[in-house]
């Protein structure tokens, strides 16, 4: 399709879906699993009207169904609820100061270290309730190393979110390399990849997780999800004055908006090519472990392609015009929001 647009008011999304050759799969239990939206709202009273809007338009159920297509209903529900609370944490830390992010981290990590035995407190932070409920259900079936990996990677998310908050308070603009390193933590993708193990009932040995090729595959999948997200979320984030990879390139390298978007698109394509090359370089650890590794790598691919398609199904990035924009790839630039 030939796309013609007024580049002063619009930009063109790169066709990442066509370049990504991974098949899109969907969990057959999608409709049987209850709504994560209702779960989060019911377990987390007192959210602001703006937060409720974001939760309701997220559609974590579809994302979980695309990214964890092989699990049963119970595990799909846990995965969907995890994604719902994770996106909520991402939203609220985007505007928090460092101290607030640190307090939030303490609340969540307290729940995630609890082994499901936390007593309710009268003064308990509201977000602790859904976090505690989620963790209690997760550890019923999650193997020990998978629990540790998810918890450690949530801790990494908060560590980098605190660093991001500190930079935001100080008006620091990161260079591209520094931003990419931070984004690998703030994306929280590695915790989602731990859920891949959980969803299919495997537990990769630590020596496999530490293997350089497996590490490279994890990093590439993380980058692919993060960079496509930065492209798709750019319009909303620029309107609210939030920096992402596009803005970093525009300010640090003097690129125009469309050139910056195309730059990230090129990085995406190079990275997916590298991912495919690395899948052919995996060593062998014996038939049983190799079979689990194949399932895990398939799960990384499910995450990459699932995130691409979900980005147009959710109303988070393009409102109710997702299907239209998926077809045309033309996005009208939103006006800047006034600073409150």
From Swiss-Prot:
The lineage of its organism: Eukaryota, Fungi, Dikarya, Basidiomycota, Agaricomycotina. Its EC number is 4.2.3.-, 4.2.3.100. Mg(2+) 3 binds at residues 229, 233, 237. A motif (NSE/DTE motif) lies at residues 229-237. Mg(2+) 1 binds at residue 90. This is Sesquiterpene synthase 6. Its cofactor is Mg(2+). The conserved DDXXD and NSE/DTE motifs are important for the catalytic activity, presumably through binding to Mg(2+). The keyword Amino-acid biosynthesis does not apply. (2E,6E)-farnesyl diphosphate binds at residues 316-317. It is an enzyme of class 4 (lyase). Keywords: Lyase, Magnesium, Metal-binding. Terpene cyclase that catalyzes the cyclization of farnesyl diphosphate (FPP) to various sesquiterpenes, including bicycloelemene, alpha-gurjunene, 9-epi-caryophylene, bicyclosesquiphellandrene, bicyclogermacrene and delta-cadinene. InterPro entries: Isoprenoid_synthase_dom_sf, Terpene_cyclase-like_2. It comes from Postia placenta (strain ATCC 44394 / Madison 698-R). Belongs to the terpene synthase family. Mg(2+) 2 binds at residue 90. The record marks 87 as: Plays a critical role in the stabilization of intermediate cation.
């Amino acid at each position: 399709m030939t796309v013609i647009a007024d580049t002063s008011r619009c930009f063109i999304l790169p066709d990442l879906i066509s370049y990504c050759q991974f098949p899109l799969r969907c969990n057959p239990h999608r409709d049987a699993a209850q709504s994560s939206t209702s779960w989060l709202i019911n377990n987390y009273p007192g959210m602001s009207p703006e937060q409720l809007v974001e939760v309701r338009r997220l559609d974590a159920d579809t994302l979980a169904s695309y990214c964890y297509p092989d699990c049963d209903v119970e595990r799909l529900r846990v995965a969907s609820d995890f994604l719902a609370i994770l996106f909520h944490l991402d939203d609220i830390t985007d505007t928090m100061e460092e101290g607030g992010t640190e307090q939030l981290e303490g609340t969540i990590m307290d729940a995630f270290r609890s082994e499901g035995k936390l007593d309710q407190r009268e003064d308990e932070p509201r977000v602790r309730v859904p976090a505690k409920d989620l963790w209690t259900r997760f550890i019923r079936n999650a193997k020990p190393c998978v629990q540790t990996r998810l918890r450690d990677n949530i801790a990494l998310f908060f560590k980098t979110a605190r660093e991001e908050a500190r930079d935001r308070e100080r008006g620091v603009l990161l260079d591209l390399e520094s931003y990419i390193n931070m984004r690998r933590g703030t994306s929280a993708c590695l915790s989602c990849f731990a859920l891949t193990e959980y969803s299919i009932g495997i537990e990769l040995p630590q020596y496999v997780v530490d293997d350089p090729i497996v590490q490279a595959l994890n990093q590439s999948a993380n980058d692919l999800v993060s960079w496509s997200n930065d492209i798709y979320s750019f319009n909303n984030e620029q309107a609210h004055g939030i920096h992402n990879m596009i803005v970093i390139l525009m300010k640090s390298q003097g690129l125009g908006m469309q050139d910056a978007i195309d730059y990230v698109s090129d990085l995406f394509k190079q990275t997916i090519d590298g991912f495919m090359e690395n899948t052919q370089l995996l060593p062998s650890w014996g038939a049983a472990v190799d079979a689990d590794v194949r399932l895990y790598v398939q799960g990384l691919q499910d995450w990459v392609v699932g995130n691409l398609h979900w980005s147009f199904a959710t109303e988070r990035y393009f409102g109710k015009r997702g299907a239209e924009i998926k077809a045309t790839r033309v996005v009208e630039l939103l006006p800047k929001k006034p600073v409150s």
